[in-house]
Amino acid sequence: MKNFNSLKTTLILAFAAITVVSGFSACKKESDAKPTISQVAVSMGGFSQLEAAAIRGGVAVVLSNKNPLASSGGAYTVFAPTNDAFARLGLVNPEDLNVLQKSFLTNVLLYHVNNGNTLQTALTGGASIPSLLGPAKRIINRNGEFYVNGSKILATNVAADNGTVHVIDKVLLASGANIAQTTIFFATAKGFTSPELSFLLEAVLYCDLAGALSDATANYTVFAPTNQAFKDLGTILGVPLNQPSDIRKLPRNTVTQVLLSHVFNLTGGGKFTSELNPGIITALNGKSVTLGAFVNGTLTVRGSGNSAAANMAIPDVQTTNGVVHVIDRVILN
């Protein structure tokens, strides 16, 4: 996964403008100097987890000067997740960040930053916003409220000496790779320090669906069950699924149909939560799946065979051929 594994010094320096380290006050020589992005973030409060993430990600170097890139006008734009945004992922305290690989964390942070001043006037529905990581972000208008991917924009145009800050309610995630590669990335513990989606990966390989999920011309919406979701499925079926290879105890056709119930070719391509509406959607295998109400930025997902709906554990992971939402139950039809 090229974007996850190749970090450039210039990108690391770029994100440093939103972090705080010792010696910070020395950068401000005059009492009337306009605050930097880092000073603005600290003064607003509620961004201590973002600071801790930047430090752990190896990008905690304060820039007292402006963006050196000539075309940037000396500015950066930062979409800044609040502490509550990190808490959605279970990252409540600084030590919780240890569950993320450092290189992954760094790339996550860089996805929130772009060169130049991107003001609110540019945040219109359908707009594409670049990032220092590479993949672009999408601005979505949902009933008059604006989102960047699936993250609601809470505040805009917070001015700084070296750019602009917009406040958002979710951490933005992008893999820079296709759906199959993204699954491999997490299953091999390159994102989290413990493997995740490894049961899903085994199922995809067992059913020979990796090619379909790698299709560069596709633009799928995928609901990806966690490892625990597959273990729970084993309990339901009476077939212990204690490790990924146990998936092969089940008939291949059965597993194939289960997997296809999680993949959707929706009109307009892969959908972020901000683009999904309550109601019935049709999976690749023709089965109907019900989306629940849009509450606090997520929706539940339920098949006709589920006794309870699945919740989104990690929503809105952007890939090169769709959007992945990690869920806590396997969809059954």
Show the residue positions of the predicted features:
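Mature, structured domains of secreted/extracytosolic soluble proteins
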Residues: 2-9, 13, 21-333
